[in-house]
């Protein structure tokens, strides 16, 4: 059976603001891929759909620019413009349905499915039903209250209840529908009097058909599911996608070597032995004998800038660009960080786009470290200033300059071209740009130790009033550049 794929994606996404200030809600990235693209690929891969109709409205040009004619994604995309997004989902379905004369699978564009069984939809669904509604087991009752439930009798749907106050059972309805052409003809009849004459709520309209005796059937979906309506829903979607395939992800540890030789080589070897690290990329200005000894070309790779004057930002970007992992961890070669914290970063990266360490938790700082007194207060001041300047993003930081951090490759790709700092300011700059990209950052306490004698030059080189002033200027300039962009 040749199926049409229908993806209504015209809504404004008000509840997801400011994420939807410049893109449609359906184009929000989930693990680096727009959710709408994920649904196009689901239709293509699980149901063999090659003819996809996308209803566009709010920021519709973003969708058209991304998909084009669909050939890049192995489908043919036809766009249906909805000039009246205020008329809600039924009007979008009506506009697209006027040109649909074949069975159609409709997925709501803001729903994310992970590990689903949509491939079984055609074989398992009632072939006589005009509408098949996908159901899935909810993890929490509040999920059901945000969606709908179906009332069954003899295996058929006889009613649909939108956002039930007291749901019974664990099943809830989803935005997966198998629709026969007759449904679109019925919708055309209801809109015969003009755009204002039709239904305003899709679930209520389906419920009226079910109560009138139109044959409808359920289909039991498996896997995990979230309807992306808010920032929290987007975070949940990212977690579900990343957690589903986390064990298959490769992790690269980028270790920035700042002039040391024997000491750095010892630390590189320790990180290479840490569970969860697939490769260590040691990046330095020039080739050093000790690093050459530990670099085996597979587990440990040595990358050099071939420039004795290369600054820290150059080394950082060079190492990250050369790393091959899906997950990128980053540290600096002054032997103050603990390899055992790698596991901590990997746990939190399931929930975040970037995880930044903080050296301000007193219980985890070795006595005698430089993170005390005026140095500690300076780091906290910069972090709190960032919170104030970007307060609407509800960020919480105490140490935005900490080098020890982890992030997804997709996050780095997003911010790469915006990193313009030339020296150690790149570390707070990365935090700023991830925030500006509206990605999620979590700060975690890490172990922090005293520097060995061979690394003491780091203190005099970077922990200066001049460095503080440069970071301060960076924060102010980036915030001023954001004025009017998302308020």
Provide a role label for each language-model segment:
Residues 9, 13-16, 27, 33, ...:
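A structural helix-start
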Residues 145-155, 308-322, 339-420, 451-462:
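Acceptor/aglycone-binding surface of glycosyltransferases and processive sugar-polymer synthases
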Residues 214, 219-277, 283-289, 296, ...:
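Hydrophobic helical membrane-anchoring modules
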């Amino acid at each position: 059976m040749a199926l049409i794929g229908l993806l209504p994606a015209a809504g404004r996404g008000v509840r997801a603001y400011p994420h939807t200030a410049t893109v449609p809600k359906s184009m929000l990235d989930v693990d680096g891929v727009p959710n709408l693209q994920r649904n196009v690929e689901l239709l293509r891969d699980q149901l063999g759909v090659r003819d996809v109709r996308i209803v566009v409205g709010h920021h519709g040009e973003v969708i058209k620019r991304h998909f084009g004619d669909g050939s890049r994604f192995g489908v043919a995309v036809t766009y249906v413009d909805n000039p009246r997004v205020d008329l809600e989902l039924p009007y979008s379905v009506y506009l697209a349905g006027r040109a649909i004369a074949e069975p159609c699978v409709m997925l709501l564009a803001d729903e994310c499915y992970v590990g689903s069984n949509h491939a079984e939809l055609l074989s398992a669904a009632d072939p006589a039903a005009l509408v098949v509604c996908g159901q899935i087991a909810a993890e929490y009752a509040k999920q059901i209250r945000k969606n709908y439930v179906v009332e069954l009798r003899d295996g058929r749907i006889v009613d649909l209840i939108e956002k039930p106050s007291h749901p019974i059972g664990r099943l809830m309805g989803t935005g997966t529908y198998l629709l026969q052409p007759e449904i679109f003809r019925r919708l055309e009849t209801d809109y015969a009097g003009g755009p204002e004459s039709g239904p305003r709520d899709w679930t209520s309209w389906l419920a009226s058909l079910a109560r009138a005796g139109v044959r409808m059937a359920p289909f039991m979906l498996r896997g995990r599911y979230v309807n992306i309506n808010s920032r929290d829903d987007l975070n949940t979607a990212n977690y579900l996608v990343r957690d589903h395939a986390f064990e298959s992800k490769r992790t690269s540890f980028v270790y920035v070597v700042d002039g040391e030789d024997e000491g750095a080589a010892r630390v590189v070897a320790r990180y290479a032995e840490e569970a969860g690290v697939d490769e260590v990329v040691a990046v330095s200005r020039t080739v050093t004998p000790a690093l050459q000894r530990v670099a085996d070309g597979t587990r440990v790779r040595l990358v050099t800038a071939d420039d004795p004057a290369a600054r820290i930002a150059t080394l950082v970007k060079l190492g990250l660009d050369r790393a091959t992992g899906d997950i990128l961890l980053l540290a600096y070669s002054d032997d103050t960080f603990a390899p055992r914290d790698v596991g901590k970063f990997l746990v939190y990266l399931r929930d975040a786009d970037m995880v930044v360490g903080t050296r301000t938790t007193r219980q985890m700082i070795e006595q005698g470290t430089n993170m005390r007194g005026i140095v500690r207060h300076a780091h906290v001041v910069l972090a709190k200033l960032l919170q104030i300047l970007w307060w609407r993003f509800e960020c919480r930081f105490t140490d935005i300059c900490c080098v020890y951090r982890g992030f997804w490759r997709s996050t780095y790709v997003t911010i790469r071209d915006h990193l313009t700092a030339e020296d150690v300011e790149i570390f707070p700059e990365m935090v700023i740009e991830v925030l500006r990209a509206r990605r999620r950052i979590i700060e975690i306490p890490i172990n922090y130790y005293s520097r060995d004698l061979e690394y003491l030059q780091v203190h005099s080189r970077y922990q200066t009033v001049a460095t503080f002033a440069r970071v301060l200027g960076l924060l102010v300039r980036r915030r001023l550049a954001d004025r009017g962009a998302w308020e």
